[in-house]
């Protein structure tokens, strides 16, 4: 297992426990949260991303990715369930690190952040799943927008709400340029060529979450933008054939694929 245990167990074991109060599901969720917490580097205040992958010989023990923001609710939940503040503390410290190195001033994001695992010092921002280093992978934007909104939900810390808004406004501005259809990378030279429906779905979900935490004058912008994205994606990507399992087509793993 690796950093994505939050994606995996929040939507399975934790969700089942919340609905059915199944004790085994609670145990599985807490076990997953403990595994995730075990990936925390206290010096750099980050949760390590991948285990050593086969596609690089470079040491990745200092690699952090924007996707990790979506794993933090598992830690927040575990802290509330157990009363152990260490879970939530790790989540907050990791979110602060992502805020410091992953979210740019204009609301765009870096996919990968490389830190020195011994000192916590910043080293690099590799390309990741986007077009290039310094570009703007759209699904990564979703993870920032949605993830910071969720961190605000659990902590009430305004800096996380502000971070979510920055990412949201960046996404809205870029999506409106292309009829609300999500391209793989908002800064790629082939801006209108490659799409990623999954980025659109995730951005819309993040906008709807964000709308729950703002006043009525702001809420409308996020709600209406989410609906525009969903309608655009439904028109271009959705397959309603009952003979086939998949509904949303047009997903893209990474730009260079």
Name each model feature, range by range.
Residues 1-257:
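Glycan-recognition and catalytic cores of secretory/periplasmic carbohydrate-active enzymes
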């Amino acid at each position: 297992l690796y950093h994505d245990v939050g994606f995996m167990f929040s939507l399975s074991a934790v969700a089942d426990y919340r609905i059915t109060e199944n004790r085994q599901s609670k145990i599985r969720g807490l076990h997953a949260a403990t595994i995730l917490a075990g990936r925390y580097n206290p010096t750099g205040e980050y949760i390590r991303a991948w285990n050593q992958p086969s596609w690089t010989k470079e040491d990745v023990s200092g690699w952090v990715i924007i996707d990790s923001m979506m794993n933090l609710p598992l830690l927040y939940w575990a802290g509330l369930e157990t009363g152990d503040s260490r879970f939530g503390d790790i989540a907050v410290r990791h979110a602060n690190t992502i805020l410091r190195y992953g979210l740019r001033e204009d609301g765009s994001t870096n996919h990968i952040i490389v830190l020195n695992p011994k000192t916590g010092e910043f080293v690099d921002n590799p390309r990741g799943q986007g077009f290039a280093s310094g570009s703007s992978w759209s699904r990564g934007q979703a993870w920032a927008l949605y993830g910071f909104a969720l961190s605000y939900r659990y902590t009430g810390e305004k800096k996380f709400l502000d971070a979510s808004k920055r990412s949201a406004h960046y996404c809205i501005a870029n999506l409106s340029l292309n009829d609300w259809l999500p391209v793989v990378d908002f800064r790629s030279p082939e801006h209108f060529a490659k799409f990623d429906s999954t980025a659109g779905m995730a951005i819309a979900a993040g906008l709807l979450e964000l709308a729950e935490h703002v006043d009525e004058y702001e809420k409308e912008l996020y709600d209406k933008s989410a609906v525009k994205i969903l309608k655009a994606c439904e028109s271009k990507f959705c397959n309603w054939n009952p003979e086939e399992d998949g509904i949303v087509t047009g997903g893209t793993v990474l730009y260079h694929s």
